[in-house]
């Protein structure tokens, strides 16, 4: 796997020996009906360890230092739905909704942000008989934030063809990952004196 990153977006990274421990508390509720599953969870984190950016305006060089972030609250709702469309076609839908809230000092200012986002994954399995199978999967993630950085929508599709050999003792699989190169992580950081964009392209295409 490889990734392409704009070099200027990497900046300089520094450690911090004065970091305090980070503490998280989690509560999760699950409800299951037959093969369907619904999950609700809440996570509260104090002192989350993050990388705080700063910029030299003369050179536009960015530096990142590890610091403790005040408070983060994270809510999630997850739904998993398996279906049997036909005798040879099964489908699974996984949908997740999230709400995250940040509250802390960040880059010298009081930083408060609450936002919603979601993701979904669709998995299809086809059984053609005589040991032949095909899987067609895809996912999508809506725009979201990480601290002051905003990530755009991204997604991907995967295709796999399988053939069972020697009375199911082994399997030959051919896989094509992200053929349309939709899985690109595009983000912008516009906060304080920083205005930058970044693009990361994981190269998952293989066969």
Question: What are the residue ranges of the model-derived segments?
Answer:
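Residues on the lipid-exposed face of transmembrane beta-strands in outer-membrane beta-barrel proteins
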Residues: 19, 27-33, 77-83, 120-126, ...
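C-terminal beta-barrel architecture of Gram-negative outer-membrane proteins
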Residues: 97-102, 117-165, 177, 188-191
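Outer membrane beta-barrel strand-and-loop segments of large Gram-negative receptors
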Residues: 14, 20, 26, 37-94, ...
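Outer-membrane beta-barrel translocator domains and adjoining extracellular loop/strand segments
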Residues: 1-5, 9-13, 48-57, 102-111, ...
């Amino acid at each position: 796997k490889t990734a392409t990153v704009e070099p200027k977006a990497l900046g300089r990274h520094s450690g911090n020996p004065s970091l305090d421990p980070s503490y998280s508390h989690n509560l999760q509720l699950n409800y299951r009906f037959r093969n369907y599953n619904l999950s609700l969870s809440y996570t509260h984190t104090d002192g989350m360890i993050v990388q705080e950016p700063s910029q030299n305006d003369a050179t536009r060089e960015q530096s990142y230092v590890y610091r403790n972030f005040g408070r983060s609250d994270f809510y999630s709702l997850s739904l998993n739905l398996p279906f049997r469309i036909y005798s040879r076609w099964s489908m699974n839908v996984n949908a997740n909704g999230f709400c995250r809230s940040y509250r802390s000092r960040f880059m010298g200012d009081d930083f408060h942000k609450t936002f919603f986002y979601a993701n979904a994954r669709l998995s299809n399995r086809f059984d053609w008989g005589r040991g032949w199978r095909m899987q067609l999967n895809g996912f999508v993630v809506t725009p979201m934030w990480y601290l002051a950085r905003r990530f755009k929508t991204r997604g991907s599709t995967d295709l796999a063809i399988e053939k069972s050999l020697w009375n199911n003792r082994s399997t030959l699989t051919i896989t094509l990952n992200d053929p349309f190169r939709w899985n690109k992580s595009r983000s912008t950081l516009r906060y304080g004196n920083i205005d930058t964009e970044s693009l990361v392209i994981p190269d998952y295409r293989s066969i």
